[in-house]
Amino acid sequence: MDNIDVIEELYNVILDRKENGKENSYTNYLFEKGIDKILKKVGEETTEVIVAAKNTNKDDLIAEVCDVIYHMVVLMVEKEVKLEDIKNELNKRRKKVGNKKPERRKIENI
C-alpha cells in the first residue's frame, strides 16, 4: 500500500465506524459525543502540532500531525465531506497560477 492509500483507508475505516459502530472504539466515542467533542479534539491536536513544531523533536511533530489528520478525517465524515471532495479542491488549487494573497496586517498591529 502506498502512502496516499493509507489516508483513503483511514477515511474508509472512520466512515465504517460512523455507519456501523464498534464497541470500545475511540472513533465511535467521538461520533457519539458529537460535533462539539470532535471540534474540541481538532483544536487540541492543532495546538499540539504548533507546540511540537516549535520544539526540535521531529518524531513528536510527525505524531502530532498524524493526530490532526485523524481528527480532521473524523470531522470530514461527521460533516459528510468526502475524501474525493478534498482531492478535487486540492487539484483545482494546484492548477492556479499567480494566486498569492496580499500581505496581511501583522497581528501585533491590530
UniProtKB/Swiss-Prot annotation:
GO cellular component, one term: cytoplasm
Chemical reaction(s) catalysed: 1-(5-phospho-beta-D-ribosyl)-ATP + H2O = 1-(5-phospho-beta-D-ribosyl)-5'-AMP + diphosphate + H(+)
EC numbers, comma separated: 3.6.1.31
CDD domains linked: NTP-PPase_HisIE_like
InterPro entries documented for this protein: HisE, PRib-ATP_PPHydrolase-like
Keyword Magnesium belongs to the record: no
One GO process term, biological-process aspect: L-histidine biosynthetic process
Cytoplasm as UniProt keyword: yes
Sequence similarity: Belongs to the PRA-PH family.
Full protein name: Phosphoribosyl-ATP pyrophosphatase
Organism: Clostridium novyi (strain NT)
